Design a protein with these regions (language model features):
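Active-site catalytic pocket residues across diverse enzymes, especially alpha/beta-hydrolases
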Residues: 179-183
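A sequence-level detector for short glycine-anchored, His/Arg-bearing signature motifs
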Residues: 163-178
Length: 203
């Protein structure tokens, strides 16, 4: 991956919180955790050079999503090298969803966003997922159809970049592929490399 710059972990923590603050599923927990930590301004007007703010954001992410060793982050490696850049279309196509039942089933078992639309069209979803609803995939894709940029997915990878797994940004990446927008949009991302990433339960 060319053109990626080194990034600091506080950037990634902020990007994760920003990505989920308006989430239908996780937004309430994230906003509550931010308010308890210091306030929504931790995301809305961050000072990434402030150690106090960075600690507060980590505290909020821990409360909302388990950073950095529980819930979503169970088994997450301590040592991660972070980078930031733009994912090219062929790189986007290599990114898989996390190993979680919802995303596994939505993609027909492959964990690949490119398989979501064929799975939806074929009606191959289990009843429990159908009840949750899938119209959001098309609604979000329609919203992105007028966009030019999608900001800051968070992708985890082995050091050789042989395996790429999405940590944050599942709805955005799904909508990109459902809308066939992967070759039109500019998609930025944080990329985390770790020799121990395969111990993460969702990898």
């Amino acid at each position: 991956m060319h053109g990626f710059r080194p990034a600091a972990e506080p950037e990634v923590v902020h990007a994760f919180l920003r990505g989920e603050i308006d989430s239908e599923r996780f937004g309430n927990d994230v906003r509550r955790a931010l308010i308890d930590a210091r306030g929504l301004e931790l995301v809305q007007s961050p000072d990434l050079n402030s150690e106090d703010e960075n600690r507060a954001r980590e505290s909020a992410l821990a409360a909302a999503r388990g950073w950095r060793n529980a819930e979503l982050f169970e088994g997450f490696p301590e040592k991660v090298e972070w980078y930031h850049g733009v994912l090219q279309p062929d790189e986007l196509e290599r990114v898989r969803f996390i190993d979680y039942s919802y995303w596994v089933e939505l993609s027909g078992g492959s964990r690949r966003p490119s398989d979501v639309l064929p799975t939806l069209r074929a009606g191959r979803l289990p009843r429990w997922l159908t009840k949750l609803g899938t119209s959001w995939c098309f609604e979000f894709a329609a919203q992105l159809a007028t966009a030019e940029v999608v900001d800051d997915l968070i992708v985890m990878a082995t050091p050789d970049l042989g395996e790429l797994v999405l940590l944050e940004g599942h709805s955005r990446l799904t909508a990109i592929f459902v809308g066939g927008l992967q070759r039109r949009l500019t998609v930025s991302a944080y990329l985390g490399l770790s020799a121990e990433i395969e111990q993460w339960g969702c990898f």
